[in-house]
Amino acid sequence: METAQHQQNNQQHYLHQHLSIGQGTNIEDGSNKNNSSNFMCRQNSTRWTPTTDQIRILKDLYYNNGVRSPTAEQIQRISAKLRQYGKIEGKNVFYWFQNHKARERQKKRLIAAATTDNTNLPMQMQFQRGVWRSSADDPIHHKYTNPGVHCPSASSHGVLAVGQNGNHGYGALAMEKSFRDCSISPGSSMSHHHHQNFAWAGVDPYSSTTTYPFLEKTKHFENETLEADEEQQEEDQENYYYQRTTSAIETLPLFPMHEENISSFCNLKHQESSGGFYTEWYRADDNLAAARASLELSLNSFIGNSS
């Protein structure tokens, strides 16, 4: 009897355990199914696609009615009104107003920055590689011109300001230092007292002078002056040595005797210090001496020296 009761108790305990396990698994499976269905619903309900009517009402509230940061109560009323035109929640209304305010602030900053740049652009001077550059649309470059100045190409290694000085000088023309084809030709003068001068400034003293041959005019004139002085000295020395060497072998020129048209006479004298001869021409100042027109040659010293 005891063994039979013990077996029945074991069977009941076994059945109870299996039933409880089965119910637990069913409960767990049901909860998992419910969780998965809820997750799918959340994925489908997270994204909000507004309709044209909803966007129109929201913009009207934002721009025309001045609603920028609606309260919770206002959000509920707005969302309830917008549900008539499509699916919408309160959080969608809240985020729409937040995003719209952020975009508007960003747009205002960009517009302010662009306005500031456009205002300061005509007034600012750009410094680039040692060259001051003004606005290219400066009317002075188009209103007044510098005749005789032709500069087709330029670079940005230095600046040369060439302008007209005088009665008709207008402004200055900025030319760069590495001009390859830069020439200055004199313009036509308007009258005898109007003249044109060209001045240059801002030239690098250590730059090559072959680019600007006209800038070396002072040095060129100095060199010409020195060369002219040297040539004059050489000519004077050559003339001196030539006179010293030729004075000893000087021959007497042939002069016509008693010529009526001669108004002067020549006197040949002997120079004892050098051993040579030199001639002296005398022009008659009075009419009587000119009418006489006699040529006197004193050869006494020459005869005495030869004897």
Swiss-Prot record:
It comes from the Eukaryota. The keyword Transcription applies. Residues 23-44 are annotated as: Disordered. Residues 43-108 bind DNA. It is found in: Nucleus. In the active shoot meristem, it is specifically expressed in a small cell group underneath the presume position of stem cells. This is Protein WUSCHEL. It comes from Petunia hybrida. The lineage of its organism: Eukaryota, Viridiplantae, Streptophyta, Embryophyta, Tracheophyta.
